[in-house]
Amino acid sequence: MSINKNLLFCGGFFFVVLYSLFVMRPFRSAVAAQIGTSDLTFFLLLVVLVMLIANGIYSLLVSKIKESKIVLFIYGFFVTNLFLYALFNYVFPNSYWVGASFYVWYNVFNFFVVSVFWARAVNCFNTDDAKKYFGVVSACGSAGAWVGSQSVYLFLSDSP
């Protein structure tokens, strides 16, 4: 198996995607604990409703914008959202609604960043190359998930 630029691009891309998910996952879990089990069902229903709306918007965007631009647009949208959540968390520390909306947002983010990645990755390879390389790409994603979770552990632990 030879290493080509599509494999490097997709492997690196998926590493970063899953890294970001696993860095944010403990914060989502903390928010879920803050929400409590009595309200969690409501917020899961809210996730489904937001996903229905977001998928409709995404379908409309995909029909109007080139594939290379849609990836930049979607990821740019989510990066902007992250900065806004950092600002909201700074301005409104310990806000129930900032945390609860982050919980919904994270679940939508989780779905979209992985789906958009695979939609892009499928177009990087022909059928034969996909059979050869998708396992490696998945392994790169798994490595990103592990490094992301370990980064949080190291950052939050008291040991040097």
Segments and roles (model prediction):
Residues 2-50:
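Helix-loop boundary and gating motifs at the non-cytosolic
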Residues 109-126:
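Intracellular juxtamembrane helix-capping segments at the cytosolic ends
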Residues 35, 52-65, 86-91, 119, ...:
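Transmembrane alpha-helix termini and helix-breaking/packing motifs in multi-pass membrane transporters
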Residues 76-95:
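C-terminal ends and interior cores of transmembrane alpha-helices
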Residues 15, 94-113:
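Hydrophobic core of transmembrane alpha-helices in multi-pass small-molecule transporters
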Residues 41-53, 131-152:
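Glycine-rich segments within core transmembrane alpha-helices of 12-TM secondary carriers
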Residues 13, 74, 136-140:
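Hydrophobic alpha-helical segments of secondary membrane carriers
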